[in-house]
């Protein structure tokens, strides 16, 4: 490991919606593409096109009309290993253009990822891609590192799942981790529904992408939802217009804050679950009473679904209402939080002290996939 200074480790953060990949030491991922694999619906429709049996990422997205699309990662956890292998292959060879047998690879995993899954990831890296070394790190822990902390509670909310993960001195506390199956994709679906009620038609998966863009560009979180609703009825101050790809212009008003309000009130889309504020509070309450103060003072937001303007103030307000009155609450929303898992991985993999933490190929050959539980925790 220590012989070549030029051997940059690779960092690959596999999300439900997007893969973020790049080189350790960089400040942002080089490649960000959708976690999708598409296969042709009919063989031979594209005669002379040199048709492939599978397309990955952006190419699958652009050819979606003739493909059946699959998302190999569901709710943050890999559910289809053949397709996952295709995504990693695409990441190394087409996006980063590297030979994986020449670089250590740091992969990320969802909190509470089943043991068999970590073993499978390890096995694929060493046996299919022949990596010299690899490591698996928990996503939320990397986000906390990226914010310069080792203790705190991370609310990580992406496209497929949200988690609250209390971390003390660098270690996640598994008994207090809570999962909420409410994330970006649900908000996009909810906005599609709201816009359909208003007479706009968004049904296909291609149109879902348009709605996702509307959500990302225009949605925000109200500090006081009821008051914002009242304001929107009498004033046009919240109205914004959005031009669709075909030139049609739609106007959206209260939908801008109604859509992400679901994060705080999941009952709005018929979900019986606590909102993100209450889930965070419940997670803190599952921790030892002595560390709660440190958690309340270091609530770190991470993931694309925490990018809504107004989210930090609202979180702070809601948690202050739940916590003991003397407690100091601090919600941290780093501007780069969309990629903070990847950034944390980049930081970790480039630390000199981390170099002895890698699982080397020799160790894997000796112990098999279960080595991952001894070396990555």
Swiss-Prot record:
**Where does this protein have coiled-coil stretches?**
none
Top-level taxon of the source organism: Eukaryota
**Catalytic activity entry:** ATP + H2O = ADP + phosphate + H(+)
Traced from the root, the source organism's taxonomic lineage reads:
Eukaryota, Viridiplantae, Streptophyta, Embryophyta, Tracheophyta
**Protein name per its UniProtKB record:** Actin-97
Its chief place of residence is cytoplasm
Please name the InterPro entries in this protein's record. Answer: Actin, Actin/actin-like_CS, Actin_CS, ATPase_NBD
Q: Could you tell me the EC number(s) of this protein?
A: 3.6.4.-
A further note on this protein reads: There are at least 13 actin genes in potato.
Q: Which SUPFAM superfamilies match?
A: Actin-like ATPase domain (SSF53067)
Family according to the record: Belongs to the actin family.
> Keywords in UniProt for this one?
ATP-binding, Cytoplasm, Cytoskeleton, Hydrolase, Nucleotide-binding
Would you tell me the Gene Ontology cellular component terms? actin cytoskeleton; cytoplasm
Supply the enzyme class, top level: hydrolase
Q: Where in the cell is it found?
A: Cytoplasm, Cytoskeleton
In Pfam terms, one family for this protein is Actin
Species whose genome carries this gene: Solanum tuberosum (Potato)
């Amino acid at each position: 490991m220590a012989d070549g200074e030029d051997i940059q480790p690779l960092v690959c953060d596999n999300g439900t919606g997007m893969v973020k990949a790049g080189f350790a030491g960089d400040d942002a991922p080089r490649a960000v593409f959708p976690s999708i694999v598409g296969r042709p619906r009919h063989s031979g429709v594209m005669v002379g096109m040199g048709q492939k049996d599978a397309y990955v990422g952006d190419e699958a997205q652009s050819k979606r009309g003739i493909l059946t699309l699959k998302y190999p990662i569901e709710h943050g956890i890999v559910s289809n290993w053949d397709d996952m292998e295709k995504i990693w292959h695409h990441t190394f060879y087409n996006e980063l253009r590297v030979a994986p047998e020449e670089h250590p690879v740091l992969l990320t995993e969802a909190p509470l990822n089943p043991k068999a899954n970590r073993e499978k990831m390890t096995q694929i890296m060493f046996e299919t891609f022949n990596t010299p070394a690899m490591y698996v790190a928990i996503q939320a822990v990397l986000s906390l590192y990226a914010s310069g902390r080792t203790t705190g509670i991370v609310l990580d909310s992406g496209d497929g799942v949200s988690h609250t993960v209390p971390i003390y001195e660098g270690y996640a506390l598994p008994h207090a981790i809570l999962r909420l199956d409410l994330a970006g994709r649900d908000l996009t679906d909810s906005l599609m529904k709201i816009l359909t009620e208003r007479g706009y038609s968004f049904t296909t998966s291609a149109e879902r992408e348009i709605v996702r863009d509307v959500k990302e560009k225009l949605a925000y979180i109200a500090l006081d939802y009821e008051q914002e609703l009242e304001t929107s009825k009498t004033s046009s101050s919240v109205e914004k217009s959005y031009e669709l790809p075909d030139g049609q212009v739609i106007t959206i008003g209260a939908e801008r804050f109604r859509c992400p309000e679901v994060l705080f009130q999941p009952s709005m889309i018929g979900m019986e679950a606590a909102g993100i504020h209450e889930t965070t509070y419940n997670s803190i309450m599952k921790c030892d009473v002595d560390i709660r103060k440190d958690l309340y003072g270091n609530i770190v937001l991470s993931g694309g679904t925490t990018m809504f303007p107004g989210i930090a103030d609202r979180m702070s307000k809601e948690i202050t209402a739940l916590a003991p009155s003397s407690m100091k609450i601090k919600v941290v929303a780093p501007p780069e939080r969309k990629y903070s898992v990847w950034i944390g991985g980049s930081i970790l993999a480039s630390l000199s002290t981390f170099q002895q933490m890698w699982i080397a190929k020799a160790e894997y050959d000796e112990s098999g996939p279960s080595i991952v539980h001894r070396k990555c925790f």
